[in-house]
């Protein structure tokens, strides 16, 4: 399962801004479709006030180009779009041109995971002007978000100084595809694992997880919950401390850790999910 398998492959052609198609129609009418062009993708400032960015998303560009076609359903939808001044947004002859059109592009990109800097090309797209224009939004959609996530993850990984970092961002990600993109970019940038099982399946990323506050709340006491989890998952026992009180949670985790050691097992880790770590 890859970039386009979640929907039908041709859906990527409509994953674009309307103005890419209106400009393409204008190029077609003006006889500029075969004019050779070069588009460069770059950014002006490093994100997060940092000194670098980490390039990501480029590995999915070849698949994007291969599947960037307009099928009958796409053409029918475009034909149904009205122009604000009346009539149809797109001319039938132009839509017929799109129906049989395939991109003919040469694309150069920095490798994923490379450090990049402002005002230098991350991706260079060369080919007929209309093709460069048609793919612009979809390509930037792949690269911009994943580069942002990879950069942030890289900063976290560096701050961790060799300790493993796991992506737990699915529940706050920008939808299902956003969750996949975050897991992919985080792994490329140095995260050791993800909580996202679908990303683990698709991209062969190691998966990792603990338990939630709801687990603790399901038992009479926090200590009961910790003991039950240690019994259920002795080889993957990470205890969440902050359901009620972090300091008491630490004491209960120590109790369970000693009990596990006596039984020949070992507490893997503890986790704090909220609050100000500096104050703790």
Predicted features along the sequence, with ranges:
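Glycine-rich phosphate/ribose-binding loops and adjacent secondary-structure elements
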Residues: 214-280
